[in-house]
Amino acid sequence: LGDVYKRQDYIENNLDSEISYDEAAQIACCSTYYFQRMFTYITGISLAEYIRRRRMTQAAFELQRTDKRVLEVALKYGYTSPTSFNRAFQNVHGISPIAAKDIGSTLNAYPAIKFSVHITGGSAMSYHIEEKGAMRIVGVRTPLVEDFETNIKSVPIFWQHTLTTVQFNQICSFTHKEPKGVLGISIYQNPNNIFYYIAASTDALVPEGMYEYEIPATTWVIFENDGYFKESVQSVFRRFYTEWLPFSGYEYAGLPDIEVYPVVEDGTIHGHSEVWIAIKKKKENT
């Protein structure tokens, strides 16, 4: 968890200055996109929301214990507009910054997140590890951005639309190669090329309006999951990062993660699903 502590220290030490997501991601040894994704899965809130809560917590402390004007505190925590600071402050505390100066006012304090590994009698995670060759996928896609908070909202809308299209039926007809099923895949190539695919693993020609992508050969840890879509899949990712990965002897490979939704005979997606996450063996310290 060394890198986790370092990136957390970076955020806490820069609440009153500019926080670079790129620099935080470098500390975490991954892309900005994957860093935000990992943070959200582990903590349950977006990185942007966490930073906002921490800054507003510190701002409230300063307003109550010092004689600083509201504008001074707003500027310190990166808000050049009193209106935007007032809005952010009220979203966290439910009252205005001026009202917060009253000693009797009730405020919300969000402490810094402390990452640790807890030993519990929790439920088992069913998994197996497989080495697979290169995988070619074909399907439809929608662009994503580096802001994971925005993507969380846009991907479900993309699913809802795609399920009603002829293209989805074509994708279902391609689901004969491993991993068998309709695949949901986030693919990060660079900050300007991030896409979410609804696709299938296939050798078929690419139909008009669809795209192909090849995922290189790698080792996968595969988790089985009996829930439906977003809530259950995100739970698998959270447990992967917090419960499985720290003790496994592996590290995250940084390749696209795959959600696998098997298709039943009537062409609908079944509730049982799998999550495929690319991993690699940790380098031993010498």
Can you say where each PLM-predicted feature lies in the sequence?
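Short, small-residue-biased leader/transition segments that mark boundaries at the very start
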Residues: L1-Y5
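…primarily DNA-binding HTH/wHTH and HhH modules…
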Residues: K6, R87-M135, E149
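Terminal helix-turn-helix DNA-binding modules in bacterial transcription factors
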Residues: D9-D22, Y41-Y77, G104-S123
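Core residues of bacterial helix-turn-helix
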Residues: A28, Y77-G78
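Short coil turns linking two alpha-helices in DNA-binding domains
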Residues: S31-Y34, T80-S81
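Short hydrophobic/aromatic patch on the recognition helix
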Residues: F35, F39, S84-F85, F89
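Structural motif
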Residues: H128-P143, Y213-D226
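C-terminal regulatory/effector modules of DNA-binding transcriptional regulators
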Residues: F148-T286
